[in-house]
C-alpha cells in the first residue's frame, strides 16, 4: 500500500478520471496480503490519507486534523479552535447521528428535533454546511440531510469562520466528517444494541485486501438504527449502506472511491405549545400532539472520489470530487397557537418535498520549502460547489381544534392536499485559494492566506395553480477573503496562537428597490494557548474570541415608524465574545477524558432581535471520563459524565419561554470479555432530571429532554 509522510515536496499537475464500483470482499486474501507487509512503499506527502485513522490509533485524542487547513497539521499548530471526536469516543457513547454527538461536544449547542434533523450551533451560529472528506454539502436540519456516523472514522469540528476554504459558510465554523477507510488486512465487526423505548442498533462492518498483493482494498458497512425516544408515536428508523475502495495505482499514486446511501423513515414531532404567557404545559414527557399518520421520508446517495499523487522529488497534489442526491418528503401536523386556560389550541398541517443535487470539487497542491534554515509550507488550490434544489410546499393553517389534555393522535388524519408553490434554487461558488505557513524562526510560524470567490444565486418561486413566477438573482465576482494566524511554541508541548478569519454570507432579503442586500460579513479574532502532552495523547486548549457579524438584514420602516412589508436594510450588527477550555485524551495510561467549558456572550448591537441567540446558554460544561480498572479487573472500564448549562430562553412577539440551568449525569460500564468480544451498558440522565432541552414559541418547539434511559450493547470483532 502507499504510505504518505511529511517531507519536502515539488509541484505536480494531476488529472483524474474515475469510475465507481464495489466488488465483493475477499477475506481469504488477508493472509496473503500479510506476507506483503514488508513491501510497503513510503512516499513523501501531506494528504488526508497520510493520517492514521482514529480507529487504529485508539483513545479519545488524535495528534492532527485537516479541518480548516486542507492538509493535515498538528492540532497545536492550527491557530483556531479544533475538536476531534474519535471512533472510540463515538462508539463508547453510542452516538448514531452527528446531532446526537453535538449535544455532548464542548462549545456546541443542539436545537433538538428528531435525531438526524436537529440544528447544530457554535458561538451562536448554525452550521449550514457539512464536509465529507473535506468536500461540502448543505446541512439543513428540516430536510434531514445530516449524515449518520456508522460510516465515519472521526468528526473534526472547527469553531469560528472558515473563510479560506468555506467563504460563504456561517460564522459558527465547519464540521468535517472523515469516512472510514479500507483495511489492508481482513478485519470486521458486528454490533448490536438494545435500549429503552425499544431502541435498537445493528451494524456489520468488514474490510480487507481484494487482491494478493494488497494494492486493492475495500470496506463495506451496513447499519440500521431505530432511534425511538420517550415521545409516543415518534418512530425514527435510519439505514446506512457504505462501500469504499482504495487502489494503489503505483507506488506513489492512490485512488479512493466511495458510495454512501442513507435512508430515514420518521414519525416527526414538533414538540409542545405553551400558555400565552410563556409558561410550560404540565403534561407527560411522552405527550405527542401530531397525527399518527405524520411521516418524514428521506433518501440520500453520496458518491465521492479522490486521486492523490506524490513525487520522490517533492510535491503532493490531490483532486477530489463529490456528488450528493437527496430526496425528502414530509407530512406533519402540529399545534399552531398558544394553549388557553382550558387546554384548547389548534392544529395546522404542513406538507413539503425537497429534491437536491449537490456537487463539490477541489484540486490542491501542497509543498514544503526551505526558508531561513527552517521548513515552511504552502498550499494552493481551486474549488467549486453547486447546490441545486426544488422545494414544494403546502400549508393548512388551522384544520382542527384539540384539547392537549384529552387528545388522541389517531383521531386526526392527513388531509387531501396539493402543493401550492415550488422554489427552485441554484447556488454556485468558484474559488481560488492559497495559504503559506512561514516558519521564520524555529519556534515561530506565521500563517497567511487569501481566497478569491465568484458566487451566483438564482431563485425562482412558482405558484403552481397559476404558473406565476417571481425570481431573484445575486452574484459577487472576485470577492477576496483574507486569513492570518500565528503560532509561537513556548516549549515542545505548549504553544500560543492567534488568528484573524473572515467570511461573507449572501442574503436573500431585498431592499426598497427590490435588490438583494449586500452580504453579511463576519470577522473573528481569536487567541489562546494549546498544549500537546504525554506524547500527543492529551490535547488541551484555552481560548478567547471576539466575533463581529455586520450587514444583517433588519426590518425597514417608513418615516412614521411603520414597518415596510417585505423590505429590509443591511443595518443589523451582532458582537459575540467568549472563552473556551478543553481537554481531550489520556490523563494517565488507563484514564481518558473529553471535557470542555464554554462561556458565550452575544450582544445584538442593532437590527431585529434574533430569538435563537436567547437559546444559547452563556455557560455550558461537558465532561466525560473513562477509566480502565486494569489493576482490579482486566478489561473492565467505568465511565461517567456530566453536561451542565445555565438558563436559556426564547422570545417572540413579546412573550418569553424559559428553562432554568440544570446538570445531567450519565454513566457507562464496558467489559472486554475477550480480545474480540465486548459488552457495554450505558445509563443516560441518571437521576431522571425533568427539563426542556429546547424552548420555542407559545405555538410549538418546546421539547422535553429524555428521561432516564438505558442502552445495552455487544460487539464482536473479526481479526
Predicted regions and their residues:
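Acidic/polar loop-and-plug regions of large Gram-negative outer-membrane beta-barrel proteins
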Residues: 225-229, 242-310, 323-356, 399-425, ...
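Outer-membrane beta-barrel translocator/receptor signature
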Residues: 150-153, 164-243, 249-253, 301, ...
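Face-selective signature of the C-terminal outer-membrane beta-barrel domain
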Residues: 303-326, 348-462
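Short acidic/polar hinge/loop motifs at secondary-structure boundaries
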Residues: 110, 119, 135-159, 178-179
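Membrane-embedded beta-barrel scaffold of Gram-negative outer-membrane proteins
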Residues: 306-312, 316-332, 489, 495-497, ...
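Structural signature of Gram-negative outer-membrane beta-barrels, strongest in the C-terminal barrel
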Residues: 246-250, 260, 356, 375-377, ...
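C-terminal beta-signal and adjacent terminal beta-strands/loops
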Residues: 643-651, 670-719
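Gram-negative outer-membrane beta-barrel transporters
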Residues: 442-443, 569-652, 687, 713-717
